[in-house]
């Protein structure tokens, strides 16, 4: 029979079958179905294919045994159906290039293909509906080819609809109605299929094919999610909801087969996409409180979508955590990306505080329990604390914020989880070390006034806290809860951070260490002081690490119990030469009054003897090191001993300083570092004794300073010169020396005021202000303000105005670019010996030293007085600004109110 004849015969048969009643279809099913299936396989006409498919589904499917559907029907027709559908997609893509409103033939062809595709999807929907209607519980093995083939068609349909703008270009309007119908049919088919799959139960004894089919279904639905995410948000969310539901429902049999990494990655991508959309909408919303605002309603819907995806991730992670080692990097990046868009990060989205709180209360709260789950994952710990994390600059602060959240959670975790986070190995740091390391990487956020949500004490108003304060407080809280077995790791992390060349890191570690000294036992504090003292003694020379250790020693010494201070003095006696340099780092104010007087006397005697030894020696540069140590310790005594330094000791120090000044050589000050140090120390000591120093010596000193400044000495020498100059304001200079000293002072100030080093210029302004406030020689003030440039600088300094304006955004950008390259290597590791039980009671800790209220009053009053004196001095030499009179009137009113308060008591 010819092909045309066969088609005609098939057409007659199909026409006849379409008129059969239900009873005949049921009776003739065994004989007719094989013939229909054969025709379906052999036919080359799309129209005939769809006719056969509709007859099978609508007339014969209802009479088939549901237990044998796979063998008798689905495995026979679905492969051919997929082949036909894919061919139609290819045909559409090819014909669409020729589509136009003038080319009716192509237009009709394309529309016919789209209509045929709609009919195919409708027939498949009928198959799914029949299976759902005839069974209460579905065995996947009886229909295992149906879900996979249907999902292939659904995905192909959605992809074609998504790409329709590019496929049909500017002629989309010619077929948009059919494309919309096609999308709706595919949407309906997927909903029907998900209802079917929801009726599937997989037991432990399920065969491997059924398990693989369910896994394939979940993965296919995940692929569909990536297609429809930008097409229909509600449908996208419902598909994810179904994926999570089925994954959890069948987890006992499919967990080892699922592509967990891809699922987690897709979920995280959808979370971030929704989150960024939410932020963009928040930035566009001008009135977040207006409920009728369309942008605000869309913002709320998107925010709920964020919460939904986060909850989905939470549930999935909870059940499959042991299978997620490969997903930990993705989860880590998710947290960092989200944190980077919130204060105090430089790259925060510009949204209102109300919207920030709304996002935090709706979305971010879900991430908190997710992090709690991840704490137990060794892979997550390894990822977050990796030694070679190499994060971009904008994620450095988010990393620290994440670690701070972790340390807040660790105290409630079992000891093994705490140990996991607090110990380190070859590939990862401990969490404490990681915080300190990353803290030194974001100088921008620390330099800006980034204030976080405040803290409120009992009966007190909320006070905003800085980023530094927040991190420091959380670290201290964690240290207070740390298990004793982890103290060696704490000590090692603190010491490594203190020895860091990054100032912020070092200061943070010192603050935490001081809290530990205050919170821990007196014995622990004494042990730490001894440890730091030994480290200082072992430093080979002056370096950043020595400076950091010396500051730490000075601070820790205040927390020592008196009994332990006595032991320290005995162990590190200043009478021993190798101990003397330690005492330049210890504030004598930390000692009790009696002990302070005793140690002051002893140290002063040792140091003055050392100076006299140098004076009676050969005065070589090689011997200057020991002299500088003695001078440095003497300066510490003078600055901190207070009344413990009696008149006899003051006289001895003054005499030896005067004798040493005679050996100062201007040329050596410029070229020899040891001479520079001695020169600076002598200037500071002279400044301390300025009221008792012989005026002839002061005249000599000023002459030397004039020569030194002309030679442009190192900055630290210039700073010492400024300290000395500021002290001269306290001094009354006799008429005989005034003409020699005062002009030189104005030259020195003028030279330093125009220095290009901004730090030196700032110190010059401060020193000049102190001098002007205290001096009785007012003529020198006008001499120093000789040029208009210097006068403007002084006025700007006093008015606290910025010399160069900069926008807030520019400040943030510049701060963000100032990334500090921190040298971070473990300098030392320290471990404590295991504590042994002891019968004696621990020593009483050092009582906290409160600043007396009267001293606070006096300090505040002196500050106000100095400010008025400075204003008075300026008025004598320059014209008053227009606003000054009104400000003085306001100040007078405030003084009257203060008087009334004092009188009322």
From Swiss-Prot:
InterPro entries in UniProt: DUF4487
Record PANTHER family: CHROMOSOME 1 OPEN READING FRAME 112, FIGNL1-INTERACTING REGULATOR OF RECOMBINATION AND MITOSIS
PTM sites of type N6-acetyllysine: 845
One GO molecular-function entry: protein kinase binding
GO annotation, biological process: chromosome segregation; interstrand cross-link repair; mitotic cell cycle
Biological role: Regulates PLK1 kinase activity at kinetochores and promotes faithful chromosome segregation in prometaphase by bridging kinase and phosphatase activities. Phosphorylation of FIRRM by PLK1 negatively regulates its interaction with the phosphatase, PPP1CC, thus creating a negative feedback loop for maintaining proper PLK1 kinase activity during mitosis. In complex with FIGL1 may regulate homologous recombination.
Main localisation: nucleus
Organism, as annotated: Rattus norvegicus
Official protein name in the record: FIGNL1-interacting regulator of recombination and mitosis
GO cellular component, one term: midbody
């Amino acid at each position: 029979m010819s092909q045309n004849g066969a088609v005609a015969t098939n057409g007659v048969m199909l026409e006849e079958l379409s008129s059969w009643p239900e009873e005949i279809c049921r009776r003739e099913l065994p004989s007719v179905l094989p013939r229909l299936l054969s025709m379906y396989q052999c036919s080359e006409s799309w129209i005939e294919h769809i006719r056969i498919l509709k007859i099978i589904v609508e007339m014969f499917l209802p009479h088939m045994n549901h237990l044998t559907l796979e063998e008798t029907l689905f495995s026979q027709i679905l492969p051919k159906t997929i082949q036909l559908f894919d061919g139609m997609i290819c045909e559409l893509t090819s014909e669409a290039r020729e589509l136009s409103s003038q080319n009716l033939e192509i237009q009709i062809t394309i529309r016919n293909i789209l209509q045929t595709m709609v009919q195919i999807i409708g027939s498949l929907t009928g198959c799914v509906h029949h299976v759902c209607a005839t069974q209460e519980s579905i065995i996947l093995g009886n229909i295992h080819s149906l879900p996979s083939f249907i999902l292939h068609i659904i995905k192909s349909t959605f992809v074609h609809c998504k790409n329709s703008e590019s496929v049909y270009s500017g002629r989309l309007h010619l077929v948009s109605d059919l494309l919309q119908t096609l999308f709706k049919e595919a949407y309906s088919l997927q909903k029907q299929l998900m209802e079917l799959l929801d009726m599937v139960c997989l037991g432990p004894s399920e065969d491997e094919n059924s398990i693989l089919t369910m896994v394939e279904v979940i993965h296919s639905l995940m692929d569909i999610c990536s297609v429809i995410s930008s097409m229909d948000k509600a449908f996208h969310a419902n598909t994810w909801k179904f994926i999570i539901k089925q994954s959890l429902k069948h987890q006992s049999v499919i967990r080892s087969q699922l592509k967990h990494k891809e699922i987690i990655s897709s979920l995280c991508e959808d979370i971030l996409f929704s989150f960024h959309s939410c932020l963009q909408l928040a930035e566009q919303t001008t009135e977040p409180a207006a409920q009728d605002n369309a942008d605000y309603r869309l913002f709320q819907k998107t925010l709920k979508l964020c919460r939904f995806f986060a909850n989905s991730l939470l549930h999935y992670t909870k059940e499959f955590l042991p299978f997620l080692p490969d997903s930990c990097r993705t989860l880590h990046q998710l947290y960092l990306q989200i944190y980077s868009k919130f204060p105090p990060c430089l790259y925060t989205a510009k949204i209102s505080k109300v919207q920030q709180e709304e996002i935090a209360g709706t979305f971010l709260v879900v991430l908190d329990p997710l992090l709690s789950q991840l704490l137990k994952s060794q892979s997550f710990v390894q990822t977050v604390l990796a030694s070679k994390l190499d994060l971009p600059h904008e994620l450095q602060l988010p990393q620290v914020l994440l670690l701070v959240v972790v340390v807040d959670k660790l105290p409630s975790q079992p000891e093994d989880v705490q140990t996991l986070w607090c110990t380190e190995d070859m590939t990862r740091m401990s969490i404490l070390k990681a915080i300190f390391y990353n803290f030194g990487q974001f100088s921008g956020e620390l330099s800006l006034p980034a204030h976080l949500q405040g803290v409120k004490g009992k009966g007190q108003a909320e006070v905003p806290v800085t980023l530094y304060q927040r991190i420091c407080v959380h670290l201290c809280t964690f240290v207070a809860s740390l298990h004793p077995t982890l103290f060696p790791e704490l000590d090692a992390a603190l010491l490594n951070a203190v020895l860091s060349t990054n100032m912020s890191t070092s200061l943070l570690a010192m603050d935490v260490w001081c809290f530990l000294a205050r919170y821990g036992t007196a014995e622990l504090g004494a042990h730490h002081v001894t440890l730091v003292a030994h480290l200082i003694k072992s430093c080979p020379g002056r370096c950043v690490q020595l400076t950091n250790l010396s500051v730490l020693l000075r601070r820790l010494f205040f927390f020592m119990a008196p009994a332990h201070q006595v032991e320290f003095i005995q162990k590190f006696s200043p009478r021993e030469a190798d101990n003397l340099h330690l005492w330049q780092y210890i504030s004598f104010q930390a000692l009790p009054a009696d002990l302070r007087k005793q140690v002051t006397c002893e140290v002063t005697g040792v140091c003055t003897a050392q100076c006299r030894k140098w004076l009676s020696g050969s005065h070589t540069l090689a011997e200057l090191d020991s002299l500088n140590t003695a001078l440095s310790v003497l300066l510490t005594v003078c600055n901190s001993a207070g009344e413990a330094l009696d008149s006899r000791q003051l006289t001895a120090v003054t005499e030896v300083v005067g004798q040493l000044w005679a050996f100062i050589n201007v040329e050596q000050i410029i070229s020899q570092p040891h001479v520079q140090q001695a020169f600076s120390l002598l200037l500071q000591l002279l400044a301390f004794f300025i009221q008792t120093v012989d005026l002839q010596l002061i005249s000599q000193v000023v002459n030397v300073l004039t020569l030194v400044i002309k030679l442009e000495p190192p900055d630290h020498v210039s700073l010492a010169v400024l300290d000395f100059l500021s002290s001269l304001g306290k001094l009354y200079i006799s008429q005989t020396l005034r003409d020699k000293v005062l002009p030189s002072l104005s030259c020195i100030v003028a030279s330093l005021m125009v220095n290009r080093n901004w730090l030196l210029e700032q110190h010059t302004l401060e020193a000049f202000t102190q001098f002007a406030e205290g001096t009785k020689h007012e003529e020198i003030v006008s001499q120093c303000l000789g040029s208009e440039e210097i006068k403007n600088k002084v006025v700007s300094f006093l008015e606290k105005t910025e010399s160069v304006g900069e926008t807030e955004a520019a400040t943030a950008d510049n701060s963000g670019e100032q990334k500090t390259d921190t040298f971070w290597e473990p300098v030392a590791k320290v471990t404590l010996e295991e504590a042994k039980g002891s019968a004696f009671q621990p020593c009483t800790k050092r009582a906290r030293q409160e600043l007396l209220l009267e001293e606070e009053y006096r300090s505040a009053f002196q500050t106000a007085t100095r400010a008025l004196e400075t204003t008075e001095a300026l008025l004598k030499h320059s014209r008053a600004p227009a606003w000054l009179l009104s400000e003085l009137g306001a100040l007078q009113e405030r003084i009257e109110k203060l008087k009334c308060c004092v009188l009322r008591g």
